[in-house]
Amino acid sequence: MGIEFTKYHGLGNDFILIDNRHGSEPMVSPEMAVEMCDRHFGIGADGVIFVLPGTSQTDYQMRIFNSDGSEPEMCGNGIRCLAQFIAELEKTTEVGKSYRIDTLGGLMTPRLEAQEQVTVDMGLPRLLGSEIPTTLVSRTEKVIDQPIEVAGQSWLVTCVSMGNPHCITFVEDVKSIALETIGPQFEHHVAFPQRTNTEFIEVLRPDYLKMRVWERGAGITLACGTGACASVVAGVLTGKSDRRCTVELPGGCLSIYWSETDGHVYMTGPAKRVFTGVYEM
């Protein structure tokens, strides 16, 4: 038995996309997703994304398994790839076409742009301790420049949920961060009961941030869309950045805007098709 798939990437954050429109649950188990994501013995990816039928209020549903088999609520680069994949399935190239996508992190609305770009209305950032979730503060408080001890060092962190948890810390030089050592300690810190994604941000200008990320369930990746969104929100909350920023990641740049009008965060970036294939079970 073989499973047809298409591989996409958003700034090097790569995914296996599967057409799952004829079933209400992912056709691949978390264990199989781990095998498919293996870069030596499988296809190789940061995660597997499934396009499932939508509800009466949405066009489609998005589900994801990370490369470790865990299931995140949302993925910013992944939803851009999902939008391009849906357009491929629907055989449309209509610029301005949008989709209402149901995710475990809430409703997301990606819109197709020219030149393989996708803009996503990521919705409202969630800032309360109970919404992250984290025990760094009370359930009704915001986490802004809160101290935390990690790897024998004190860090000031700001926490934001974009449908999934993010812990953001601003540093002088992102290159100097030993991400492979510090990242897992943030992810599994006792203050984050559902674990966390962690972004290390260097402010080059108020409208230009440089970011490295340790993703919950995936480790070091070349890009994280929700992380870029959360980082701009954190930058505004701490007075370090503008509401409209370019965020530079190892895989390229994203344009992020936290609107004062509706409070939503908007992300624009690429989603590129790599290849199609059949994975033999």
Curated annotation (Swiss-Prot):
**Family annotation (InterPro entries):** DAP_epimerase_AS, DAP_epimerase_DapF
Q: Would the keyword Metal-binding be found if you checked this record's keyword annotation? A: no
| Record-annotated active site | C75, C224
Keywords, in A-Z order: Amino-acid biosynthesis, Cytoplasm, Isomerase, Lysine biosynthesis
Binding residues for substrate: N13, N66, G76, N77, N164, N197, E215, R216, G225, T226
**Site described as Could be important to modulate the pK values of the two catalytic cysteine residues, positions?**
H166, E215
* GO biological process assignments: lysine biosynthetic process via diaminopimelate
Q: Name one GO molecular function term.
A: diaminopimelate epimerase activity
Q: Which GO terms describe its cellular component?
A: cytosol
Q: Subunit info?
A: Homodimer.
HAMAP family assigned: DAP_epimerase
Job of this protein: Catalyzes the stereoinversion of LL-2,6-diaminopimelate (L,L-DAP) to meso-diaminopimelate (meso-DAP), a precursor of L-lysine and an essential component of the bacterial peptidoglycan.
Q: What is this protein called?
A: Diaminopimelate epimerase
Upper lineage is: Bacteria, Bacillati, Cyanobacteriota, Cyanophyceae, Oscillatoriophycideae
**Gene name of the encoded protein:** dapF
